[in-house]
Amino acid sequence: MNFNKIKSMHFPSDVYIGHDAILNIGSVVSKFLKSGEVLLITGENTYNIAGKKVLSNLNDFDVNVIIASRATRDSIKSIEESLKNRRSGIVLGVGGGSKIDIAKKIAYDLGIPFISVPTTPSHDGIASPRASIYDGKSVYSEEATMPSAIVADTSIMVLAPYRYVAAGAADVISNITAVLDWKLANRLKGEEFSSTAAVMSEYAGRELIERSSMIQPGLEESIWLVTKQILASGAAMAIAGSSRPASGSEHLFSHAIEILGPGSSIHGEQCAMGSLISMYLHGGDWELLKNTYRKIGLNTRAESYGIGREVAIKALSIAHRIRPSRYTILGESDLSYNVAERILSITGII
Protein backbone atom coordinates (compact mmCIF):
# COMPACT_ATOMS: atom_id res chain seq x y z
CA MET A 1 0.00 0.00 0.00
CA ASN A 2 1.38 3.40 -0.99
CA PHE A 3 1.46 6.08 1.69
CA ASN A 4 0.76 9.54 0.30
CA LYS A 5 -0.59 11.45 3.26
CA ILE A 6 0.84 14.90 3.96
CA LYS A 7 -0.03 17.51 6.55
CA SER A 8 1.27 21.02 7.09
CA MET A 9 1.62 22.41 10.62
CA HIS A 10 2.87 25.85 11.60
CA PHE A 11 4.06 26.90 15.06
CA PRO A 12 5.53 30.11 16.51
CA SER A 13 9.30 29.93 16.19
CA ASP A 14 9.95 32.70 18.73
CA VAL A 15 8.08 32.99 22.02
CA TYR A 16 8.88 35.54 24.69
CA ILE A 17 6.83 35.39 27.89
CA GLY A 18 7.70 37.31 31.00
CA HIS A 19 8.54 40.63 32.59
CA ASP A 20 9.59 43.27 30.02
CA ALA A 21 9.34 40.73 27.19
CA ILE A 22 8.23 43.57 24.92
CA LEU A 23 11.81 44.88 24.84
CA ASN A 24 12.51 42.03 22.40
CA ILE A 25 9.99 43.21 19.82
CA GLY A 26 12.59 44.96 17.65
CA SER A 27 14.75 41.88 17.21
CA VAL A 28 11.67 39.74 16.56
CA VAL A 29 10.45 42.08 13.81
CA SER A 30 13.95 42.15 12.29
CA LYS A 31 13.89 38.38 12.00
CA PHE A 32 10.58 38.14 10.14
CA LEU A 33 10.30 41.39 8.17
CA LYS A 34 11.79 40.87 4.71
CA SER A 35 10.66 44.14 3.12
CA GLY A 36 8.04 46.85 3.48
CA GLU A 37 6.63 48.44 6.59
CA VAL A 38 5.28 47.19 9.88
CA LEU A 39 1.48 47.20 10.14
CA LEU A 40 0.56 47.63 13.80
CA ILE A 41 -3.08 46.91 14.58
CA THR A 42 -4.32 47.89 18.02
CA GLY A 43 -7.23 49.55 19.82
CA GLU A 44 -7.62 52.95 21.45
CA ASN A 45 -7.03 51.69 24.97
CA THR A 46 -4.42 49.09 24.08
CA TYR A 47 -2.45 51.65 22.10
CA ASN A 48 -1.95 53.62 25.30
CA ILE A 49 -1.33 50.50 27.38
CA ALA A 50 1.15 48.76 25.10
CA GLY A 51 1.14 50.19 21.58
CA LYS A 52 3.26 53.20 22.46
CA LYS A 53 5.81 50.99 24.16
CA VAL A 54 5.94 48.73 21.11
CA LEU A 55 6.49 51.76 18.87
CA SER A 56 9.32 53.01 21.06
CA ASN A 57 11.13 49.75 20.34
CA LEU A 58 10.58 49.96 16.57
CA ASN A 59 12.49 53.15 15.76
CA ASP A 60 14.43 51.39 12.98
CA PHE A 61 11.26 50.54 11.03
CA ASP A 62 8.51 52.31 9.13
CA VAL A 63 5.33 51.65 11.09
CA ASN A 64 1.72 52.11 10.00
CA VAL A 65 -0.54 52.22 13.07
CA ILE A 66 -4.21 51.38 12.64
CA ILE A 67 -6.67 51.79 15.50
CA ALA A 68 -9.25 49.06 14.93
CA SER A 69 -12.60 48.30 16.50
CA ARG A 70 -14.60 45.07 16.46
CA ALA A 71 -13.45 42.00 14.53
CA THR A 72 -16.05 42.04 11.76
CA ARG A 73 -15.77 41.18 8.09
CA ASP A 74 -16.62 44.78 7.22
CA SER A 75 -13.92 46.26 9.48
CA ILE A 76 -11.31 43.87 8.09
CA LYS A 77 -12.33 44.67 4.51
CA SER A 78 -12.11 48.40 5.27
CA ILE A 79 -8.60 48.07 6.70
CA GLU A 80 -7.44 45.97 3.76
CA GLU A 81 -8.82 48.57 1.33
CA SER A 82 -6.76 51.25 3.09
CA LEU A 83 -3.61 49.16 2.61
CA LYS A 84 -3.82 48.84 -1.17
CA ASN A 85 -1.24 51.57 -1.83
CA ARG A 86 1.05 50.55 1.03
CA ARG A 87 3.71 47.87 1.29
CA SER A 88 2.92 45.97 4.48
CA GLY A 89 5.57 43.35 5.22
CA ILE A 90 4.48 42.12 8.64
CA VAL A 91 1.47 42.52 10.94
CA LEU A 92 1.65 43.10 14.68
CA GLY A 93 -1.53 42.58 16.67
CA VAL A 94 -1.27 44.53 19.93
CA GLY A 95 -4.25 44.14 22.20
CA GLY A 96 -6.89 41.74 23.37
CA GLY A 97 -8.71 39.05 21.46
CA SER A 98 -10.51 41.11 18.82
CA LYS A 99 -7.47 43.14 17.77
CA ILE A 100 -5.36 40.01 17.49
CA ASP A 101 -8.12 38.30 15.49
CA ILE A 102 -8.18 41.24 13.06
CA ALA A 103 -4.39 41.25 12.76
CA LYS A 104 -4.02 37.52 12.14
CA LYS A 105 -6.84 37.52 9.57
CA ILE A 106 -5.31 40.43 7.65
CA ALA A 107 -1.90 38.74 7.77
CA TYR A 108 -3.53 35.63 6.33
CA ASP A 109 -5.24 37.57 3.54
CA LEU A 110 -2.04 39.45 2.68
CA GLY A 111 0.19 36.39 2.98
CA ILE A 112 2.64 38.01 5.39
CA PRO A 113 3.93 37.07 8.88
CA PHE A 114 1.99 37.88 12.02
CA ILE A 115 3.33 38.64 15.50
CA SER A 116 0.99 38.38 18.48
CA VAL A 117 1.50 40.94 21.26
CA PRO A 118 -1.32 40.31 23.75
CA THR A 119 -2.24 42.80 26.44
CA THR A 120 -4.38 40.30 28.32
CA PRO A 121 -4.64 36.49 28.45
CA SER A 122 -8.40 36.68 27.91
CA HIS A 123 -8.68 33.69 25.55
CA ASP A 124 -6.64 31.23 23.53
CA GLY A 125 -6.92 33.19 20.29
CA ILE A 126 -3.65 34.96 21.07
CA ALA A 127 -1.77 31.80 20.07
CA SER A 128 -3.97 30.03 17.53
CA PRO A 129 -4.32 29.90 13.74
CA ARG A 130 -8.04 30.70 13.96
CA ALA A 131 -9.85 34.04 14.09
CA SER A 132 -13.33 34.69 15.48
CA ILE A 133 -15.03 36.98 12.96
CA TYR A 134 -18.50 38.52 13.31
CA ASP A 135 -20.57 39.01 10.14
CA GLY A 136 -23.50 40.90 11.65
CA LYS A 137 -25.51 37.79 12.44
CA SER A 138 -23.14 35.20 13.83
CA VAL A 139 -19.56 34.57 14.90
CA TYR A 140 -17.42 32.36 12.71
CA SER A 141 -14.10 30.67 13.41
CA GLU A 142 -12.05 31.30 10.28
CA GLU A 143 -8.66 30.15 9.12
CA ALA A 144 -5.99 32.74 9.87
CA THR A 145 -2.22 33.03 10.21
CA MET A 146 -0.50 31.23 13.06
CA PRO A 147 1.76 33.70 14.88
CA SER A 148 5.36 33.53 13.70
CA ALA A 149 6.21 34.89 17.12
CA ILE A 150 4.46 35.71 20.38
CA VAL A 151 5.65 38.46 22.69
CA ALA A 152 3.67 38.31 25.93
CA ASP A 153 4.86 40.89 28.43
CA THR A 154 3.50 39.89 31.82
CA SER A 155 4.30 43.32 33.29
CA ILE A 156 1.79 44.80 30.82
CA MET A 157 -0.75 41.98 30.91
CA VAL A 158 -1.01 42.11 34.71
CA LEU A 159 -2.39 45.66 34.40
CA ALA A 160 -5.52 44.38 32.65
CA PRO A 161 -8.62 43.84 34.79
CA TYR A 162 -8.35 40.48 36.56
CA ARG A 163 -11.65 39.49 35.02
CA TYR A 164 -9.84 38.89 31.72
CA VAL A 165 -7.27 36.65 33.37
CA ALA A 166 -9.99 34.49 34.94
CA ALA A 167 -11.84 34.38 31.61
CA GLY A 168 -8.68 33.29 29.79
CA ALA A 169 -8.14 30.53 32.32
CA ALA A 170 -11.75 29.40 31.89
CA ASP A 171 -11.40 29.34 28.11
CA VAL A 172 -8.48 26.93 28.46
CA ILE A 173 -10.18 24.83 31.16
CA SER A 174 -13.14 24.42 28.81
CA ASN A 175 -10.79 22.53 26.46
CA ILE A 176 -11.62 19.50 28.59
CA THR A 177 -15.21 19.39 27.38
CA ALA A 178 -14.16 20.30 23.83
CA VAL A 179 -12.01 17.17 23.76
CA LEU A 180 -14.90 15.06 25.08
CA ASP A 181 -17.04 16.34 22.21
CA TRP A 182 -14.26 15.64 19.72
CA LYS A 183 -13.94 12.06 20.92
CA LEU A 184 -17.72 11.68 20.65
CA ALA A 185 -17.71 12.99 17.07
CA ASN A 186 -14.89 10.62 16.20
CA ARG A 187 -16.78 7.66 17.66
CA LEU A 188 -20.23 8.45 16.25
CA LYS A 189 -19.44 10.35 13.06
CA GLY A 190 -15.99 9.10 12.14
CA GLU A 191 -14.51 12.58 12.41
CA GLU A 192 -10.73 12.75 12.07
CA PHE A 193 -9.10 12.77 15.49
CA SER A 194 -5.60 13.58 16.71
CA SER A 195 -4.61 11.96 20.00
CA THR A 196 -1.60 14.28 20.26
CA ALA A 197 -3.69 17.43 19.89
CA ALA A 198 -6.35 16.10 22.26
CA VAL A 199 -3.86 15.19 24.98
CA MET A 200 -2.11 18.56 24.71
CA SER A 201 -5.35 20.50 24.84
CA GLU A 202 -6.79 18.57 27.76
CA TYR A 203 -3.49 18.80 29.65
CA ALA A 204 -3.58 22.60 29.37
CA GLY A 205 -7.03 22.69 30.96
CA ARG A 206 -6.24 20.22 33.73
CA GLU A 207 -2.99 22.00 34.56
CA LEU A 208 -4.95 25.16 35.31
CA ILE A 209 -7.42 23.23 37.46
CA GLU A 210 -4.59 21.73 39.49
CA ARG A 211 -2.88 25.11 39.92
CA SER A 212 -6.01 27.22 40.24
CA SER A 213 -5.00 28.48 43.69
CA MET A 214 -2.17 30.37 41.98
CA ILE A 215 -4.54 32.30 39.71
CA GLN A 216 -5.12 35.48 41.68
CA PRO A 217 -5.64 39.22 41.05
CA GLY A 218 -2.52 41.36 40.70
CA LEU A 219 -0.16 38.39 40.55
CA GLU A 220 2.19 38.49 37.56
CA GLU A 221 2.91 34.80 37.99
CA SER A 222 -0.80 34.14 37.34
CA ILE A 223 -0.40 35.75 33.93
CA TRP A 224 2.64 33.57 33.29
CA LEU A 225 0.75 30.41 34.27
CA VAL A 226 -2.37 31.11 32.20
CA THR A 227 -0.46 32.33 29.15
CA LYS A 228 1.71 29.22 29.02
CA GLN A 229 -1.38 27.01 28.85
CA ILE A 230 -2.93 29.30 26.25
CA LEU A 231 0.15 28.61 24.14
CA ALA A 232 -0.31 24.87 24.64
CA SER A 233 -3.93 25.22 23.53
CA GLY A 234 -2.85 27.12 20.43
CA ALA A 235 -0.28 24.44 19.61
CA ALA A 236 -2.98 21.76 19.90
CA MET A 237 -5.09 23.60 17.34
CA ALA A 238 -2.09 23.90 15.03
CA ILE A 239 -1.51 20.15 15.24
CA ALA A 240 -5.18 19.39 14.58
CA GLY A 241 -5.44 21.92 11.79
CA SER A 242 -8.67 23.25 13.29
CA SER A 243 -10.10 24.68 16.50
CA ARG A 244 -11.57 21.27 17.40
CA PRO A 245 -9.27 20.55 20.39
CA ALA A 246 -10.41 23.75 22.08
CA SER A 247 -13.92 24.37 20.79
CA GLY A 248 -16.92 22.13 21.35
CA SER A 249 -20.43 22.47 22.72
CA GLU A 250 -19.26 25.02 25.30
CA HIS A 251 -18.20 27.34 22.48
CA LEU A 252 -21.45 26.77 20.59
CA PHE A 253 -23.32 27.90 23.70
CA SER A 254 -21.00 30.91 23.96
CA HIS A 255 -21.64 31.93 20.35
CA ALA A 256 -25.40 31.48 20.80
CA ILE A 257 -25.27 33.80 23.81
CA GLU A 258 -23.35 36.37 21.76
CA ILE A 259 -26.01 36.29 19.05
CA LEU A 260 -29.03 36.46 21.35
CA GLY A 261 -27.67 39.01 23.79
CA PRO A 262 -24.45 38.55 25.78
CA GLY A 263 -25.24 41.14 28.41
CA SER A 264 -21.87 42.13 29.85
CA SER A 265 -20.27 38.69 29.57
CA ILE A 266 -17.04 38.04 27.68
CA HIS A 267 -15.94 34.96 25.77
CA GLY A 268 -14.23 33.01 28.54
CA GLU A 269 -17.09 33.58 30.96
CA GLN A 270 -19.56 32.26 28.40
CA CYS A 271 -17.34 29.23 27.77
CA ALA A 272 -17.18 28.58 31.51
CA MET A 273 -20.97 28.38 31.66
CA GLY A 274 -21.01 26.27 28.52
CA SER A 275 -18.47 23.84 29.92
CA LEU A 276 -20.70 23.14 32.94
CA ILE A 277 -23.54 22.25 30.58
CA SER A 278 -21.31 20.08 28.43
CA MET A 279 -19.69 18.25 31.33
CA TYR A 280 -23.09 17.59 32.89
CA LEU A 281 -24.39 16.12 29.62
CA HIS A 282 -21.27 13.99 29.27
CA GLY A 283 -21.88 12.64 32.78
CA GLY A 284 -18.62 14.09 34.06
CA ASP A 285 -17.63 16.06 37.15
CA TRP A 286 -19.16 19.42 36.30
CA GLU A 287 -19.00 20.43 39.96
CA LEU A 288 -15.18 20.26 39.82
CA LEU A 289 -15.27 22.81 37.01
CA LYS A 290 -17.76 24.99 38.88
CA ASN A 291 -15.66 24.92 42.05
CA THR A 292 -12.53 25.77 40.06
CA TYR A 293 -14.23 28.75 38.44
CA ARG A 294 -15.40 29.88 41.86
CA LYS A 295 -11.85 29.53 43.19
CA ILE A 296 -10.42 31.80 40.49
CA GLY A 297 -13.21 34.33 41.00
CA LEU A 298 -15.33 33.63 37.93
CA ASN A 299 -19.11 33.64 38.32
CA THR A 300 -21.07 31.08 36.30
CA ARG A 301 -24.54 32.48 36.94
CA ALA A 302 -26.05 34.03 33.81
CA GLU A 303 -27.88 36.81 35.62
CA SER A 304 -24.59 38.13 37.03
CA TYR A 305 -23.75 39.21 33.47
CA GLY A 306 -27.18 40.57 32.65
CA ILE A 307 -28.10 37.47 30.64
CA GLY A 308 -31.79 36.84 31.14
CA ARG A 309 -33.24 33.46 31.99
CA GLU A 310 -35.08 33.22 28.66
CA VAL A 311 -31.96 34.16 26.69
CA ALA A 312 -29.93 31.44 28.40
CA ILE A 313 -32.62 28.81 27.75
CA LYS A 314 -32.98 29.84 24.11
CA ALA A 315 -29.19 29.84 23.66
CA LEU A 316 -28.89 26.28 24.91
CA SER A 317 -31.86 25.16 22.81
CA ILE A 318 -30.36 26.42 19.54
CA ALA A 319 -26.61 26.16 20.22
CA HIS A 320 -26.21 23.11 17.99
CA ARG A 321 -27.34 25.21 15.01
CA ILE A 322 -24.39 27.57 15.28
CA ARG A 323 -22.04 25.19 13.52
CA PRO A 324 -23.99 22.19 12.20
CA SER A 325 -20.86 20.51 10.84
CA ARG A 326 -19.35 20.33 14.34
CA TYR A 327 -20.99 17.42 16.13
CA THR A 328 -21.11 17.69 19.93
CA ILE A 329 -22.98 16.29 22.92
CA LEU A 330 -25.78 18.76 22.06
CA GLY A 331 -26.75 16.54 19.14
CA GLU A 332 -28.47 17.63 15.96
CA SER A 333 -31.92 18.71 17.18
CA ASP A 334 -33.15 21.60 19.31
CA LEU A 335 -33.44 20.87 23.00
CA SER A 336 -36.95 21.43 24.32
CA TYR A 337 -37.57 24.43 26.56
CA ASN A 338 -38.10 22.22 29.61
CA VAL A 339 -34.96 20.15 29.05
CA ALA A 340 -32.79 23.23 28.50
CA GLU A 341 -34.27 24.90 31.58
CA ARG A 342 -33.61 21.81 33.69
CA ILE A 343 -29.96 21.53 32.60
CA LEU A 344 -29.33 25.21 33.28
CA SER A 345 -31.03 24.98 36.68
CA ILE A 346 -29.11 21.89 37.78
CA THR A 347 -25.77 23.46 36.88
CA GLY A 348 -26.72 26.71 38.61
CA ILE A 349 -26.47 28.86 35.50
CA ILE A 350 -30.05 30.08 36.00
Swiss-Prot record:
Protein name as annotated: Glycerol-1-phosphate dehydrogenase [NAD(P)+]
BP GO annotations: glycerophospholipid metabolic process; phospholipid biosynthetic process
UniProt keyword annotations, A-Z: Cytoplasm, Lipid biosynthesis, Lipid metabolism, Metal-binding, NAD, NADP, Oxidoreductase, Phospholipid biosynthesis, Phospholipid metabolism, Zinc
Family label: Belongs to the glycerol-1-phosphate dehydrogenase family.
Cofactor: Zn(2+)
Residues at which NAD(+) binds: G97, S98, K99, I100, D101, T119, T120, P121, S122, S128
Listed GO CC annotations: cytoplasm
UniProt-listed Enzyme Commission number(s): 1.1.1.261
Compartment(s) of residence: Cytoplasm
GO MF annotation list: glycerol-1-phosphate dehydrogenase (NAD+) activity; glycerol-1-phosphate dehydrogenase (NADP+) activity; metal ion binding
Note on cofactor: Binds 1 zinc ion per subunit.
Main location as per UniProt: cytoplasm
Residues annotated for substrate binding in this entry: D124, D171, H255
Gene behind the chain: egsA
Role this protein plays: Catalyzes the NAD(P)H-dependent reduction of dihydroxyacetonephosphate (DHAP or glycerone phosphate) to glycerol 1-phosphate (G1P). The G1P thus generated is used as the glycerophosphate backbone of phospholipids in the cellular membranes of Archaea.
Residues that hold Zn(2+) according to the record: D171, H251, H267
Source organism, top-level taxon: Archaea
Catalytic activity entry: sn-glycerol 1-phosphate + NAD(+) = dihydroxyacetone phosphate + NADH + H(+); sn-glycerol 1-phosphate + NADP(+) = dihydroxyacetone phosphate + NADPH + H(+)
Pathway(s): Membrane lipid metabolism; glycerophospholipid metabolism
